[in-house]
A protein has these predicted regions:
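Conserved N-terminal catalytic/coupling substructures associated with nucleotide/phosphate chemistry
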Residues: 1-176
Protein backbone atom coordinates (compact mmCIF):
# COMPACT_ATOMS: atom_id res chain seq x y z
CA UNK A 1 0.00 0.00 0.00
CA UNK A 2 1.45 3.32 -1.03
CA UNK A 3 0.03 6.73 -0.36
CA UNK A 4 0.15 9.59 -2.84
CA UNK A 5 2.37 12.42 -1.69
CA UNK A 6 2.56 16.16 -1.97
CA UNK A 7 6.18 16.83 -1.02
CA UNK A 8 6.00 20.62 -0.85
CA UNK A 9 9.27 22.30 0.08
CA UNK A 10 12.05 21.58 2.55
CA UNK A 11 11.60 22.85 6.11
CA UNK A 12 13.52 22.51 9.38
CA UNK A 13 11.81 19.14 9.86
CA UNK A 14 11.63 17.98 6.22
CA UNK A 15 14.68 17.11 4.11
CA UNK A 16 14.74 15.93 0.48
CA UNK A 17 17.56 13.71 -0.79
CA UNK A 18 18.09 12.83 -4.44
CA UNK A 19 19.02 9.21 -5.19
CA UNK A 20 19.72 9.70 -8.92
CA UNK A 21 22.88 8.92 -10.92
CA UNK A 22 25.32 7.12 -8.59
CA UNK A 23 22.80 7.25 -5.75
CA UNK A 24 22.98 9.01 -2.41
CA UNK A 25 25.98 7.92 -0.31
CA UNK A 26 24.82 6.28 2.93
CA UNK A 27 26.95 8.76 4.91
CA UNK A 28 24.89 11.70 3.54
CA UNK A 29 21.63 10.02 4.53
CA UNK A 30 23.00 9.30 8.02
CA UNK A 31 24.12 12.95 8.39
CA UNK A 32 20.65 14.19 7.41
CA UNK A 33 19.08 11.87 10.01
CA UNK A 34 21.52 13.04 12.74
CA UNK A 35 20.80 16.72 11.97
CA UNK A 36 17.02 16.16 12.24
CA UNK A 37 17.34 14.11 15.45
CA UNK A 38 19.46 16.89 17.02
CA UNK A 39 16.84 19.52 16.16
CA UNK A 40 13.16 18.54 16.49
CA UNK A 41 13.01 15.31 14.50
CA UNK A 42 11.20 15.11 11.17
CA UNK A 43 11.31 13.29 7.84
CA UNK A 44 13.88 12.57 5.17
CA UNK A 45 12.36 11.83 1.77
CA UNK A 46 14.85 9.76 -0.21
CA UNK A 47 14.21 9.98 -3.95
CA UNK A 48 12.94 13.59 -3.96
CA UNK A 49 14.85 16.53 -5.47
CA UNK A 50 15.36 19.84 -3.62
CA UNK A 51 12.45 21.38 -5.56
CA UNK A 52 10.06 18.68 -4.28
CA UNK A 53 9.99 16.59 -7.49
CA UNK A 54 9.90 12.83 -6.88
CA UNK A 55 12.53 11.07 -9.02
CA UNK A 56 12.62 7.74 -7.17
CA UNK A 57 15.06 5.63 -5.18
CA UNK A 58 17.62 3.16 -6.46
CA UNK A 59 17.12 -0.57 -5.84
CA UNK A 60 19.78 -0.66 -3.09
CA UNK A 61 17.70 1.82 -1.05
CA UNK A 62 14.30 0.13 -1.57
CA UNK A 63 14.49 -2.03 1.58
CA UNK A 64 13.04 0.01 4.48
CA UNK A 65 14.14 -2.52 7.13
CA UNK A 66 17.73 -2.65 5.83
CA UNK A 67 17.84 1.15 5.58
CA UNK A 68 16.62 1.55 9.19
CA UNK A 69 19.22 -0.98 10.40
CA UNK A 70 22.02 0.79 8.49
CA UNK A 71 21.06 4.14 10.09
CA UNK A 72 20.94 2.61 13.61
CA UNK A 73 24.38 1.02 13.03
CA UNK A 74 25.93 4.30 11.91
CA UNK A 75 24.59 6.61 14.64
CA UNK A 76 25.76 7.05 18.26
CA UNK A 77 23.66 6.45 20.26
CA UNK A 78 21.70 4.44 17.65
CA UNK A 79 18.74 6.36 16.18
CA UNK A 80 15.66 4.23 15.69
CA UNK A 81 14.01 5.53 12.52
CA UNK A 82 10.93 4.25 10.73
CA UNK A 83 11.41 3.91 6.98
CA UNK A 84 8.59 3.16 4.55
CA UNK A 85 7.99 3.09 0.81
CA UNK A 86 5.70 5.91 -0.32
CA UNK A 87 5.05 7.65 -3.62
CA UNK A 88 2.56 7.23 -6.41
CA UNK A 89 4.17 5.66 -9.48
CA UNK A 90 7.63 6.80 -8.38
CA UNK A 91 9.06 4.96 -5.36
CA UNK A 92 10.20 7.25 -2.56
CA UNK A 93 11.42 6.23 0.90
CA UNK A 94 10.06 8.24 3.81
CA UNK A 95 12.37 8.06 6.84
CA UNK A 96 10.66 9.26 10.04
CA UNK A 97 13.27 10.57 12.48
CA UNK A 98 12.42 11.02 16.18
CA UNK A 99 13.68 14.02 18.16
CA UNK A 100 16.64 12.79 20.19
CA UNK A 101 16.64 13.25 23.96
CA UNK A 102 20.43 13.49 23.96
CA UNK A 103 23.02 14.66 21.44
CA UNK A 104 23.60 12.14 18.64
CA UNK A 105 26.42 11.86 16.12
CA UNK A 106 27.40 9.79 13.14
CA UNK A 107 29.63 6.80 13.94
CA UNK A 108 32.52 8.86 12.50
CA UNK A 109 31.85 11.58 15.10
CA UNK A 110 29.99 14.23 13.07
CA UNK A 111 27.40 16.11 15.13
CA UNK A 112 24.96 18.13 13.03
CA UNK A 113 21.78 20.17 13.52
CA UNK A 114 19.24 21.87 11.25
CA UNK A 115 18.98 25.63 10.90
CA UNK A 116 17.45 28.17 8.55
CA UNK A 117 19.69 30.06 6.15
CA UNK A 118 19.18 33.79 5.52
CA UNK A 119 17.12 32.99 2.39
CA UNK A 120 14.64 30.94 4.46
CA UNK A 121 15.78 27.52 3.28
CA UNK A 122 16.97 24.89 5.76
CA UNK A 123 20.43 23.35 5.96
CA UNK A 124 22.34 20.88 8.12
CA UNK A 125 25.29 22.49 9.92
CA UNK A 126 27.87 21.29 12.47
CA UNK A 127 26.91 21.46 16.14
CA UNK A 128 29.89 22.98 17.95
CA UNK A 129 31.00 22.02 21.48
CA UNK A 130 29.52 25.15 23.10
CA UNK A 131 26.17 24.37 21.40
CA UNK A 132 26.11 20.86 22.87
CA UNK A 133 25.83 22.24 26.43
CA UNK A 134 22.97 24.51 25.31
CA UNK A 135 21.19 21.59 23.60
CA UNK A 136 21.52 19.38 26.70
CA UNK A 137 20.28 22.23 28.88
CA UNK A 138 17.27 22.77 26.56
CA UNK A 139 16.48 19.05 26.88
CA UNK A 140 16.71 19.28 30.68
CA UNK A 141 19.78 17.00 30.67
CA UNK A 142 22.30 19.57 31.91
CA UNK A 143 22.16 21.52 35.15
CA UNK A 144 24.26 24.68 34.74
CA UNK A 145 24.16 25.19 38.53
CA UNK A 146 26.02 21.87 38.91
CA UNK A 147 28.93 22.99 36.72
CA UNK A 148 32.26 23.72 38.47
CA UNK A 149 33.18 27.40 38.82
CA UNK A 150 36.92 27.82 38.11
CA UNK A 151 38.74 29.84 40.76
CA UNK A 152 35.87 29.73 43.28
CA UNK A 153 36.80 29.43 46.96
CA UNK A 154 34.78 28.66 50.08
CA UNK A 155 34.75 32.41 50.87
CA UNK A 156 32.65 32.98 47.72
CA UNK A 157 29.70 31.27 49.41
CA UNK A 158 27.38 33.12 51.79
CA UNK A 159 28.05 31.78 55.35
CA UNK A 160 24.31 31.97 56.17
CA UNK A 161 23.45 29.87 53.12
CA UNK A 162 26.15 27.35 54.07
CA UNK A 163 24.58 27.05 57.57
CA UNK A 164 21.12 26.67 56.03
CA UNK A 165 22.39 23.92 53.74
CA UNK A 166 24.02 22.10 56.69
CA UNK A 167 20.66 22.16 58.55
CA UNK A 168 18.81 20.82 55.50
CA UNK A 169 21.34 17.99 55.13
CA UNK A 170 21.24 17.04 58.83
CA UNK A 171 17.40 17.09 58.80
CA UNK A 172 17.39 14.89 55.69
CA UNK A 173 19.90 12.46 57.23
CA UNK A 174 17.94 12.15 60.52
CA UNK A 175 14.67 11.48 58.68
CA UNK A 176 16.05 8.33 56.98
Amino acid sequence: WRMAHEYGKETLSKEFKSDRDKGLPDSELVEAVVALANTDGGCVYLGVEDDGTATGVQRKHQDPVGLSAMIANRTVPPISVRAQLVGDGVTVIQVDVPKSHSVVSTKSGRILRRMMKVDGTPESVPMYPYEIATRLSDLGKLDYSAQPVPGATREDFDPLERDRLRKIISTYRSSR
